[in-house]
A protein has these predicted regions:
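Alpha-helical cap/lid subdomain in secreted, periplasmic
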Residues: 1, 81, 85-88, 107-125, ...
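Bacterial N-terminal signal peptides
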Residues: 7-15
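Boundary at the C-terminal end of the N-terminal hydrophobic targeting segment
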Residues: 19-21
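N-terminal pre-domain segments of enzymes
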Residues: 23-89, 158, 446-509
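Short, flexible loop segments at the rims of nucleotide/cofactor-binding pockets, characterized by
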Residues: 70-72, 146-152, 232-233, 516-518, ...
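Catalytic nucleophile-elbow at a beta strand-turn-alpha helix junction centered on a G-D-S/GDSL motif
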Residues: 90-105, 130-134
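Residues that mark the start of a beta-strand
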Residues: 91-93, 123, 538, 761
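Beta-propeller domains with acidic blade repeats across secreted/periplasmic ectodomains
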Residues: 478-767
Length: 767
């Protein structure tokens, strides 16, 4: 490294023993003796038969292999016989690790519990936290001190306060996965769990009796490839499951045995339930909600009915009340009202694997003449099929009740977003932390989320009811003639750009032989935070309108923008909004067929799967990153020469990351690295104030800049600890200490665009 140049630049059930592959089948009401009842149509897989040990006969001339000792059967926990009754006004606490935290983004669990309680005002408070334990270890960031300087029990104190403020009357607890991965003992987990339950009991609201629900962790799913199989981990998880099951009996709690209900059998062809083996995907959360519904003795809101060609309803129907059945020459009309909104699965592009598993119901029309028929409700198409399919029972997954169900779930997710910003706002260090006096009284904005949450809840309560529908079965050709014209599909809505004038270039003091050109000026570039080029020469930019923190009532509208120079004139002439509705994206790096984006608590991978230039696949790769200071959160994404993805965090951030291999915790600045194909992450470097620059020389050696502390440039030694790391026994000094500006960004020059004597030098910016 010859010299340093300072350059100013402008500028993301399975089959179980209870057969919960979807909502449990609605039982057929008891019938009088000798009454003819149609054979029930099962909406769920048949219950799995107990697996029997087999003793194959060895081939002639071969010795029988010694038998391995049989694996002991896991302990059985009979389902509680009482139904969990909710009471209007219940304050429902959802607390746990990443299992519970990610549930708020799907809304399926809350939705299932809501539709069973139409007319009751239930208030859900999800305070799940990735990497957390019953001791609240991940919550010390809610305190007032800098990361690494808080007392050892700060997380527990903050967890106690959160629970006390909510005053729960129903508590749903979902701990175990993080603890099973961090090397803790079962005895410590049980002790912490007992203490947590006792505090919940002591903090419970007095109006309604406290009801407890304990959820086990899910099983570690074997996804194949280079990910861990989970076999060894499941042995540990079974022990956590047993502890939680025993505690549920001790505390008279409902036990939701997710480990057993969601464990896929080896070789099963059912859809995958997780994204990485330990975190549920959308379908996994839908199945989880079915398991909870079953465990709480809540009858699933699926439906089924059958009608003869003479208009007589067949026995054995459930979930819907029918009336005014009038047969016609080709079809019939009838009225119907569901008992409750259906358990709709909202994943787009479901495909055949989900068709029957996630159907909300099944309808039979017997004795129809040959031909194709369409069923509509309130002039909304439900299903089109031929007479044979209708006679056998058509699976239903559409209609006005489905539309209403999805709207209700959407409102629940939006309410959860508001509560997240209220209970765990970004930029805590400046809201109530040790730097709260530096930016004015921003904390006054936090309670402003409360009325917004109440408004969203009132919409939820009003929508949570079924309506009587007018159904009509008619020839499909007749429907084609009268159905409402399909609204032309609109392109993705983009806010109209405000008129702007070309801005004059600022005056730069340039070195000899250098010039500055304007590459792009774009109204969507609100606050560009990081940018990186891909192999096609396109510039990917993470742009934020929300930074530094979301305001009450503000929507998360941040974007990933692709800028292209298609005619090689040195200026971008094409702009594409690749992704929006992001929350303060602070890091971006193209790769693996899409782009990695650091936003809020997550590292995302966004991908365009249909070739329209817009991301339609969004995957959470890692979560649990701290947000105590939004210019410290996950940033500086860059591919390493070793094929790993590197990314940084700054001094005030506390990260508690659950991976399929282990739980990783970093409560300080530092540099991470991740091998995406195995999801094996590690802390590469610890320390720094604001490590906003990281790059490699031609030998793959790392160099890191610091935006504070006068450290200049540091040589990255794997595993080393640097200035500010609070718990370091020894710190590695910078290679260029001195009174520098606050460095932001780092490039090591290997380009003919720069003079020969710059090659191999480091360039950076002033913050």
């Amino acid at each position: 490294m010859k010299s340093f140049h300072l350059v100013f630049t402008a500028f993301a059930i399975a089959v179980t023993t209870q057969a919960i592959g979807q909502a449990p089948k609605r039982p057929v009401p008891a019938q009088p003796k000798k009454q003819i009842v149609s054979k029930p149509v099962r909406l769920t897989p048949q219950p799995a038969k107990p697996q029997q040990a087999t003793n194959p006969v060895p081939a002639a001339g071969t010795a029988a292999k010694p038998k391995s000792p049989p694996k002991p059967a896991i302990k059985s926990f009979p389902r509680k016989t009482q139904k969990l009754n909710f009471i209007g006004g219940d304050q429902v606490l959802l607390i746990g690790d990443g299992l519970v935290e990610q549930a708020q983004k799907q809304g399926y669990l809350e939705y299932r519990l809501m539709v069973h309680n139409s007319g009751k005002k239930l208030h859900f408070h999800n305070i799940g936290w990735s990497g957390d334990t019953p001791a609240g270890i991940a919550r010390d960031g809610l305190g007032t001190r800098q990361a690494g300087h808080e007392p050892a029990n700060e997380g527990w104190l903050q967890l106690r306060k959160q629970i006390t403020d909510i005053k729960p009357t129903v508590a749903i607890i979902g701990y175990g996965m993080a603890r099973s991965l961090d090397g803790s003992t079962l005895e410590q987990f049980k002790s912490d769990y007992q203490r947590l339950v006792e505090h919940i009991k002591g903090s419970a609201g007095k109006k309604n009796r406290l009801r407890l629900v304990f959820m086990s962790p899910i099983a570690h799913e074997d996804l194949g490839g280079k990910l861990p199989s989970g076999e060894a981990h499941n042995i540990v998880l079974e022990k956590y499951r047993e502890v939680i099951g025993d505690l549920s009996k001790e505390h008279d709690a409902w036990f939701v045995d997710l480990y057993r209900y969601l464990k896929r059998r080896k070789g099963a062809t059912t859809p995958l339930l997780t994204t990485d083996g330990i975190h549920l995907n959308e379908y996994g959360y839908w199945v989880m909600s079915s398991a909870a519904e079953f465990s709480l003795n809540l009858m699933a809101t699926n439906f089924r009915f059958g009608i003869m060609n003479n208009g007589v309803e067949r026995n054995g129907g459930y979930g819907i009340k029918l009336g005014n059945i009038l047969p016609a020459a080709k079809g019939m009309t009838l009225d119907g009202q569901f008992d409750g909104l259906p358990p709709y699965f909202a994943l787009e592009k479901k495909g055949k694997p989900f068709t029957q598993k996630t159907a909300i119901g099944r309808i039979q029309f017997m004795g129809l003449p040959e031909g194709r028929y369409t069923l509509v409700a309130d002039n909304v198409e439900i299903h089109t099929a031929d007479a044979k399919e209708w006679s056998g029972g058509a699976f239903i997954d559409a209609g006005p009740d489905v539309d209403q169900a999805e709207e209700l779930r959407r409102l629940l997710v939006e309410k959860n977003d508001l509560f997240f910003h209220r209970s765990r706002p970004q930029n805590q260090a400046y809201l109530w932390g040790f730097r709260r006096h530096e930016q004015g009284n921003n904390f006054r904005e936090v309670p402003m989320f409360d009325p917004l949450i109440r408004q969203k809840e009132e919409k939820i309560f009003a929508l949570n009811k079924t309506a009587k529908r007018s159904y009509k079965l008619m020839p499909a050709d007749d429907w084609e003639k009268i159905k409402p014209s399909e609204t032309a599909k609109k392109s993705e809505a983009i806010a109209e750009a405000k008129p702007f004038k070309t801005q004059p270039l600022p005056r730069f003091d340039l070195g000899e032989g250098l010039e500055v050109n304007l590459f792009a000026q774009n109204p969507h570039l609100a606050k560009p935070i990081q940018m990186n080029f891909d192999a096609k020469g396109r510039l990917w930019v993470a742009s934020s309108e929300v930074y530094p923190q979301i305001l009450p009532g503000q929507m998360a509208t941040d974007k990933v923008i692709i800028l292209e120079d298609t005619n090689d004139d040195g200026q971008a002439d094409k702009s594409t909004v690749f992704a929006d509705n992001l929350l303060i994206p602070t890091g971006i790096e193209p790769g693996d067929g899409g782009v990695y984006v650091g936003q809020s608590t997550e590292l995302l991978h966004l991908k365009d799967t249909d070739g329209d230039g817009v991301a339609d696949d969004r995957r959470v790769v890692m979560s649990g990153f701290g947000t105590e200071d939004t210019h410290h959160i996950l940033h500086t994404l860059r591919w390493g020469f070793d094929g790993r993805l590197y990314f940084n965090q700054s001094i005030y951030i506390r990260t508690h990351m659950e991976t399929p291999h282990e739980v990783l915790r970093l409560e300080s600045g530092g540099v991470w690295r991740l091998r995406p194909e195995t999801l094996k992450a590690e802390i590469f470097l610890r320390g720094f104030c604001n490590p906003w620059g990281h790059h490699y020389d031609e030998f793959g050696q790392s160099f890191v800049t610091d935006g504070a502390g006068g450290q200049g440039l540091s040589y990255g030694v794997p595993g080393a600890m640097y200035f500010t790391y609070a718990r370091a026994p020894r710190l590695l000094d910078s290679v260029s200490p001195g009174r520098y500006p606050k460095f932001c960004g780092l490039e090591i020059v290997r380009s003919s665009h720069f003079p020969d004597d710059w090659q191999g030098d480091a360039i950076t910016c002033d913050f």
